[in-house]
Amino acid sequence: MGCFFSKKSRRKSPKKDAALPTGDESATGNDLAETNNTALGSNSNQEAPKQYSWDKREKVDPKDFMLTGLKNETVGRLPGKLNGQQFVIQDCENCNIFVLDHSATITIDDCVNCRIVLGPVKGSVFFRDCKDIKCVVACQQFRTRDCKKMDVFLCCATQPIIESSTGMKFGCFQYYYPELAFHFKDAGLSIFNNNWSNIHDFTPVSGETNWSLLPEDAVVLDHVPLPDPESEFKSVRIATEAGRSIVPLTKGSRRTESEESCLFVFFAGDYTTANARKLIDEATAKGFVLIQTKEVSMRPEDVSRVFQNNAESLTEWITKGPVVALELNGDGVVEACRSFANEVFNGTQLFVSESKNTSSRDVDNFFNFADMQMGL
């Protein structure tokens, strides 16, 4: 079916202060000084009261984690300002909003005509009662309710959900700033798990289409501009080109131009992510298209089901961590990927489809397993 390549204390009671003489009127000044020094010395040896985590916790000002009632402004948060906290955006109009940090959850309510960039969100991003929004979002869960006309460049680990929303358009996340890769890691998100085009409409209307995909050549800057040069974000090096994006640009559920696809799997190692990015660069430079990617953990029984005849040789490789899989598409892609495996990744632990006769089955076996594993 395919081929693979490998290389080998309890708290102490505080001491009591030494008692100063009170009844001995003959005590000299030197005696008193010495006694005082002794007392001070005893105090200095006392053990400090035990501190608990809630004693050390910094006080949080809720206003630092909200943007409310703003109009015609460029606002947001710089890297390092949220550090995994929750964030709220509400009642903003005609604003450019840049939240360039990782967070726990973000809710956006009653905003109109805003351009928004949200750094990686560990939990959910929830838009409610918003209109005319253009945004770049990376999150675990994405949901909208009662929204109209949104253009979303999305990276979402689970299936995005829209509810009572119309005029929704989606594209693949394309964004870069220097801290973004670290923010993905801090938020527990994989750049390879992106279901941006797999939208679930919770309230479909017969005969109407509430959502669609943005044109394949859609450019982020045409929807979400860079920060104002006079704003606090002017020092952040932002890029929106697909080749610079932290998240790989995938075709998603759009129709493929070729019937030939290839499964390419990297097993866990020190350079798995770098190798996957290199393969994408090599393949796209030759005109092939990246359809989808996944990063998942596998068990021995999963290997048997997915890789079938090659399972025995691959089982030991899955113990080192998750695998990263890519589907590449285009006429001649299988032969090209096998050449990449031999010439570029020789000695790397990987699996690549053996022939175009079995490659479609390889792709279906792996990504059906991955979707089940992730509950999609």
Curated annotation (Swiss-Prot):
It comes from the Eukaryota. One of its GO terms (biological process) is retina development in camera-type eye. In the retina, detected in both rod and cone photoreceptors (at protein level). Has strongest expression in the retinal outer nuclear layer (ONL) and weaker expression in the outer plexiform layer (OPL) and inner plexiform layer (IPL) (at protein level). Expressed in all tissues tested. GO terms for cellular component: cilium; periciliary membrane compartment. SUPFAM superfamilies: C-terminal domain of adenylylcyclase associated protein (SSF69340), Nucleoside diphosphate kinase, NDK (SSF54919). A lipid is attached at residue 2 (N-myristoyl glycine). Disruption phenotype: Viable and fertile. Early retinal development appears to be grossly normal. Outer segments of rod and cone photoreceptors show progressive degeneration from 2 months of age, with rod cells more severely affected in the early stages. Its main location: membrane. GO terms for molecular function: GTP binding; GTPase activator activity. Pfam families: TBCC. Residues 49-204 form the C-CAP/cofactor C-like domain. The keyword Protein transport applies. Keywords: Cell membrane, Cell projection, GTP-binding, GTPase activation, Lipoprotein, Membrane, Myristate, Nucleotide-binding, Palmitate, Protein transport, Transport. Myristoylated on Gly-2; which may be required for membrane targeting. Palmitoylated on Cys-3; which may be required for plasma membrane targeting. Residues 1-55 are annotated as: Disordered. A lipid is attached at residue 3 (S-palmitoyl cysteine). Residues 25-48 have a biased composition (Polar residues). It is a lipid-anchor. It is found in: Cell membrane; Cell projection, Cilium. GTP binds at residues 123-124, 140-143. Belongs to the TBCC family. This is Protein XRP2.
